[in-house]
């Protein structure tokens, strides 16, 4: 039964120059082994989704024009050519290969993607930035850079849609261009093949502490200083024009304030902006963004790439988040990093991670991968949110939000309407401990088509106060990893709170 979707991201195919993360002499055999695994399982695989950063336009030194898509294909014929590994997958799956853009390939176009073809005259399909296999709304696939401050498309500068992360990656590439020994490439070094090309922990920490000044100033100056790269050097862009880091700093000077504004402004906007910065820094809060997206779009599973860190699930959530990992760890990092991909069973939405493993001189083989789970909070177990499902599937009336109250916390997802025959999830999250000692507590009022009002109240305290659940004719509740209690029973302790209210009018 062909019910499985394979998700592969972050290959970073480029021109195989010394500053390219992907080196075909190292990574190609692993990638081809994955493609052959897909071909050999074509009786059960319905589709291969290439989930962003498949090619890479970012890892060129300052004085080099980034490679074109055509040039990358020419440099990687055994992968992308008409008789290459991807072409074999195209023919085995009857053309069911779909390309979703990431950040390092955000300039890829539909004509670029569809130019990849097979001897069977199948072409890769282009899905833009967001994709649901088989138009199944339960599943959302996107690269994930959209949730990160330094790598999300930025439409506010003259370099749009390039984010500041593009220039950070160019800084690192220029540094290695100057410092690699003859015949050496970055895949031989530790801590390479990562979203921005280096371990920039201290620099990002400084940037995120500088909320009242330009994060771009701190970030660019800090990384350029660390890498000893002059900010006056010309940077050659893909159209042949040039810029400098001085100009880049000025263009992105409002980066943090822009993130605050587009996420609601004030304290709540600042919280989202900080999460977006931390998501780039150490992949934290990617689970938070995945859950927010799932609730907003009524999805059950979100699969992303971008972080280069495989994730097998989401702790204490009504939905699931999986990260497929990446395909270009450096040789020095292969003892701790792995070349991985995800497989979704579309009937159950169970998602399994696999990785390509090479032992000695043997060809790489494919094996299941055990990976950590993510959390929506930075300290697992410290989520004091209320997750509230209002089940309107048995009702003949639509519901419209007419009011809400907040004692503690803030709404991350608050549907303004719930159609008859559907359900919706509300998310009330507690503020971070440094801002509030309380958990979350609030209420909402919805009105149906007949003018009847329904109030739902809920609370998940941090201190020794009672958990609250009330409203509707029937509800069921639980906390944490506990079991759902009998109808209309309120948990005595635990966190976070999950409650499902059922309407039957």
Segments predicted by a language model, with ranges:
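Extended recognition/assembly regions associated with phosphoester-bond processing machinery
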Residues: 1-370
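Intrinsically disordered, low-complexity segments enriched in small/polar residues
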Residues: 371-505
């Amino acid at each position: 039964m062909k019910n499985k979707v394979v998700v592969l991201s972050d290959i970073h195919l480029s021109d195989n120059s010394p500053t390219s993360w992907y080196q075909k002499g190292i990574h190609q055999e692993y990638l081809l082994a994955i493609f052959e695994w897909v071909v050999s399982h074509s009786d059960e695989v319905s589709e291969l989704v290439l989930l962003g950063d498949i090619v890479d336009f970012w890892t060129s030194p300052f004085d080099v024009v980034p490679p074109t898509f055509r040039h990358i294909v020419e440099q990687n014929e055994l992968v992308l050519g008409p008789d290459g590994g991807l072409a074999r997958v195209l023919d085995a799956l009857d053309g069911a290969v779909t390309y979703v853009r990431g950040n390092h390939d955000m300039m890829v176009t539909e004509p670029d993607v569809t130019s990849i073809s097979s001897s069977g005259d199948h072409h890769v399909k282009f899905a833009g930035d967001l994709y649901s296999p088989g138009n199944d709304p339960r599943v959302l696939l996107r690269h994930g850079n959209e949730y990160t401050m330094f790598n999300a498309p930025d439409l506010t500068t003259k370099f749009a849609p390039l984010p500041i992360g593009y220039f950070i990656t160019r800084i690192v590439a220029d540094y290695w261009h100057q410092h690699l020994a003859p015949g050496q490439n970055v895949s031989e070094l530790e801590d390479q093949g990562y979203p921005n090309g280096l371990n920039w922990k201290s620099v990002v920490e400084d940037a995120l502490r500088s909320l009242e000044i330009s994060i771009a100033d701190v970030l660019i100056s800090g990384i350029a200083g660390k890498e000893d790269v002059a900010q006056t050097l010309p940077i050659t862009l893909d159209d042949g024009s040039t810029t400098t880091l001085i100009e880049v700093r000025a263009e992105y000077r409002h980066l943090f304030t822009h993130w605050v504004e587009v996420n609601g402004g004030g304290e709540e906007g600042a919280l989202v902006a900080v999460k977006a910065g931390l998501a780039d820094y150490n992949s934290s809060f990617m689970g938070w963004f995945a859950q927010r997206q799932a609730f907003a779009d009524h999805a059950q599973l979100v699969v992303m790439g971008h972080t280069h860190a495989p994730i097998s699930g989401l702790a204490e959530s009504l939905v699931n988040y999986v990260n497929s990992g990446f395909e270009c760890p450096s040789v020095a990092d292969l003892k701790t990093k792995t070349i991985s991909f995800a497989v979704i069973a579309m009937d159950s939405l169970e998602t399994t991670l696999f990785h390509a493993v090479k032992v000695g001189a043997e060809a790489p083989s494919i094996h299941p991968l055990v990976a950590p789970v993510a959390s929506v909070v930075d300290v697992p177990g410290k989520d004091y949110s209320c997750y509230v499902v209002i089940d309107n599937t048995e009702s003949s009336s639509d519901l419209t939000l007419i009011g809400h109250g907040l004692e503690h916390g803030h709404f991350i997802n608050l549907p303004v309407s719930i159609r008859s025959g559907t359900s919706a999830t509300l998310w009330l999250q507690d503020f971070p401990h440094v801002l509030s000692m309380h958990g979350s507590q609030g209420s909402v009022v919805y009105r149906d088509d007949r003018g009847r009002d329904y109030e739902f109240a809920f609370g998940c305290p941090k201190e020794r106060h009672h958990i609250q659940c009330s409203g509707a004719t029937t509800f069921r509740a639980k906390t944490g990893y506990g079991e759902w209690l009998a109808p209309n029973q309120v948990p005595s302790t635990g966190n976070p709170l999950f409650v499902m209210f059922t309407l039957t009018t």
